[in-house]
Amino acid sequence: DPIDPLAPCVGPYFLYGTLMDPSLLSEILALPEKPRLRPAKLTGYSLKLWGQYPALVDGATGEVVEGMAYDVESEQHAEKLAAYETRAYRSAPCRIRFMDGGEPGDISGTTFQYAGNPMDITEGKFDLGVWLRRMGRDGAGNQ
């Protein structure tokens, strides 16, 4: 079968923002158990804000964005993540560097980059804890 270039990618994803919350990720993907996330980072990117949500954009050469890596095992899961991220984001290839000392130390993967109007993003920091409290999700999956 020819590979569909528009098919969602499976494999390692670099997640940042709301998707770093294990309970939210479990909900979106309807996972039977808590997802295994590895602390990770991307180099050469920057996080801005799109409204209350973080927006990953190209950054300076040495700029680092920290997040979590998650292994997406099915196209259905990749599609659910893309739907959650909306059309304001597009999946893009990236080089994920792990921060937990485990192997492999880095790997090729996928992330969601902001694809909306650059005029709509602002400088600012996204705080997952504050967002979870605002959404009434505080501590929902942190036991």
Where are the language model's segments positioned?
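Glycine-aromatic micro-motifs
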Residues: D1-Q143
